[in-house]
Amino acid sequence: MAHETSFNDALDYIYIANSMNDRAFLIAEPHPEQPNVDGQDQDDAELEELDDMAVTDDGQLEDTNNNNNSKRYYSSGKRRADFIGSLALKPPPTDVNTTTTTAGSPLATAALAAAAASASVAAAAARITAKAAHRALTTKQDATSSPASSPALQLIDMDNNYTNVAVGLGAMLLNDTLLLEGNDSSLFGEMLANRSGQLDLINGTGGLNVTTSKVAEDDFTQLLRMAVTSVLLGLMILVTIIGNVFVIAAIILERNLQNVANYLVASLAVADLFVACLVMPLGAVYEISQGWILGPELCDIWTSCDVLCCTASILHLVAIAVDRYWAVTNIDYIHSRTSNRVFMMIFCVWTAAVIVSLAPQFGWKDPDYLQRIEQQKCMVSQDVSYQVFATCCTFYVPLLVILALYWKIYQTARKRIHRRRPRPVDAAVNNNQPDGGAATDTKLHRLRLRLGRFSTAKSKTGSAVGVSGPASGGRALGLVDGNSTNTVNTVEDTEFSSSNVDSKSRAGVEAPSTSGNQIATVSHLVALAKQQGKSTAKSSAAVNGMAPSGRQEDDGQRPEHGEQEDREELEDQDEQVGPQPTTATSATTAAGTNESEDQCKANGVEVLEDPQLQQQLEQVQQLQKSVKSGGGGGASTSNATTITSISALSPQTPTSQGVGIAAAAAGPMTAKTSTLTSCNQSHPLCGTANESPSTPEPRSRQPTTPQQQPHQQAHQQQQQQQQLSSIANPMQKVNKRKETLEAKRERKAAKTLAIITGAFVVCWLPFFVMALTMPLCAACQISDSVASLFLWLGYFNSTLNPVIYTIFSPEFRQAFKRILFGGHRPVHYRSGKL
């Protein structure tokens, strides 16, 4: 049996609840009543306001005269905050002309129940819906005594999915389309059957067509959404935990990763691990349940941990950028970067994060905080001043600092890459030397460039083998220890300091240099190649891994991994180079002979794999022997038989226990040469460096007269020039290849910095723009889905950090492999620097 009903002014408001968590939304409420037939007057201003309001085709409220009434007023001139606060206490309206009580908000009551039923699809909720609607329909008024006048509905928040449900339900009640007698569930069933149709809400003589939206999601769709959300968020949490645990474990277990620069990386991993363990799980519960159901106390704890851990993670990125910048631009920073200094940086980062996170707990909250909790919304304090303070301290200022520092680092690396070009080598050319000496010097210099990837040997005590002359005219050549303290050179990489090896690290005695030229030996080439390799590594040490630093034996610092990884960045065919033992002996020093740690081959000493280059080096060695043989006959005072030496300057690289062994030409007959004695007879470059006076090799030769000596010397020099001329042709490609490498290194440096800064900006920028917009723009509405996406995108930065800050380090990669596959490093292992 159908019933007729009239709303008149009975409609107070529509107050609908989100089905999953009873989150309340204001959907609609009436404007001041229109004049009824008994002549009751209304305020002219309110009538004019009512006439201005209209509902668009898509259900949005529009002010036809652009009076902005929809933003200012909701009911009888009340502002939204006051109106919402009075909703819960508003009694059912009564007709002032009669004693008959009209229906008390039947549409609101039915809409609330319908929303609850749409969530659980439970029979009990459906019965409540049906009974509430039945009571509203059975409340009648005498249509003849009180003609019906339709209420004017002001529709608010029409983009909410449940708005059209409520309006559609009201239309069904008004149009008397449901038969409710004897069937409590018929209302719910009818709404499901009619979910996609159109219902006509009668408004006087006109009509408003409202399309009803889906009353309830299917059980399968609901479960599927929850399952997909749970799996995705669960995987993200798991990956974040595993990644950061691996970083922490690698630093703890690997001795070569235990250095002061990696302390910042470890602290960053701890902050990201807290995000994964304390913040993400509660956030996942919030997302799956679509509302905060854990109470206000836990909401305070969750928001505080969220701000604390995320702020600490971001500020650690700033600290790492500052550390790298100082390492690149300040040559003395490598000595002042102590454990205490780094720990102070970490302490400042966590202290700032605690201050920002605990400020709301000491009263810096907005007045609507508790009301949001009742609506099952858990958010950080929306106080405008706090949001400006928090977002600036947490993101905007750190963003500017990071961008500025990494831009400076990129400019420095780019400048050094372009400066690393072949330069003419100073040759100690005697006036009696033929013109062919200059060409010989150039060829050997080019060969030195080809040796850039050769890793020199190191000794257990860190001895450095050097060849130097006096400061006035001599040039220092040295094999720098792999464990020596590496400084970041701020001068051009191909130009070494004019001073000799630092006096603090030298224990050798320089022998005075004579006018004779130094003999260009293979060890000289290797030494120069070592210096070239060291300057190459410095150019982007702060770009690809941690900033370069060294190990000082007195304070127990471990060698950095930055130098080793940077060489991999800068060479297109890099290999991991292990340490090579070196035994240094000298007639001028008492350094003694140190027992080597391992066979050079077992330690993976890199040898030149290019057969052509090996052949060229063997030719140079043979040339050296011929020079030695030529210098053994007679007391010749001519230097024409000696080959032009490659002179360079020793870099200002202080070593831990470096021993500089001075070696200079004591005379034409006693010139000292530096050779590499092979420990592996199959390869001439794998062995220990020995410094010994050269003695004439015994050989049979016919006595020569003084008249024959010039001819023999000229013949020997001609043979030497012919031998070296065979090396010239392959060297013509060096410059072109070097330019290609420079462009590649520059692109790789830019790519690395773009990954570091780009990941940070992409992950956090949307969230912090939204966080600053919401309190400043009250009229701006951001959907819950978009807000959740931006929040979890920021959390995703904690997932990326362990990848970004370790993937460029080969030592971290090797450590991860050992952790995964159970490998272990030998006890005597020491990390060598490239």
Swiss-Prot record:
It is a multi-pass membrane protein. Disulfide bonds join 299-378. Glycans are attached at residues 68, 97, 161, 175, 183, 194, 203, 209. Residues 56-75, 420-442, 460-516, 531-599, 617-640, 674-743 are annotated as: Disordered. GO terms for biological process: adenylate cyclase-inhibiting serotonin receptor signaling pathway; anesthesia-resistant memory; chemical synaptic transmission; G protein-coupled receptor signaling pathway, coupled to cyclic nucleotide second messenger; inter-male aggressive behavior; male courtship behavior; phospholipase C-activating serotonin receptor signaling pathway; regulation of circadian sleep/wake cycle, sleep. Belongs to the G-protein coupled receptor 1 family. This is 5-hydroxytryptamine receptor 2A. It comes from Drosophila melanogaster. The lineage of its organism: Eukaryota, Metazoa, Ecdysozoa, Arthropoda, Hexapoda.
